Amino acid sequence: MVVVANAQELSGQDNPEVQRVEPFQVFDNLYYVGGKWVAAWLLETDQGLILFDSLYGDLTDLVIDGIRELGFDPDDVRYIIITHAHYDHIGGARRFQEEFGSVV
């Protein structure tokens, strides 16, 4: 018998329960809202919130939940800055656009 598995599936990279990290304040107005293997950062400004990267798929829920756990409202995410064009960093951007009106 031959078993072929996707290494990403085996590692739990797509599983929000495995990837969950308690969101935390890094310093001043910068917060971590990402997962264990891919980062997302939230910057609080006078103009609203700026999110750096949005994760993807179910992991985008980690970002949204983290924003709420820190006492912020995802509706206040005005801008999303994508650090680079890998799917794990950009996949949730459309969701933020559609649900919260964020500008990418």
Where are these regions (language model features)?
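Sec-dependent N-terminal signal peptides
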Residues: 1-2
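Intrinsically disordered, low-complexity N-terminal regions enriched in serine/proline/glycine
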Residues: 5, 30-31, 78
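Boundary at the C-terminal end of the N-terminal hydrophobic targeting segment
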Residues: 5-12
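Conserved beta-strand hairpin/beta-sheet module of binuclear metal-dependent hydrolase folds
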Residues: 16-74
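Active-site metal-binding motif and surrounding structural segment of the metallo-beta-lactamase
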Residues: 47, 59-104
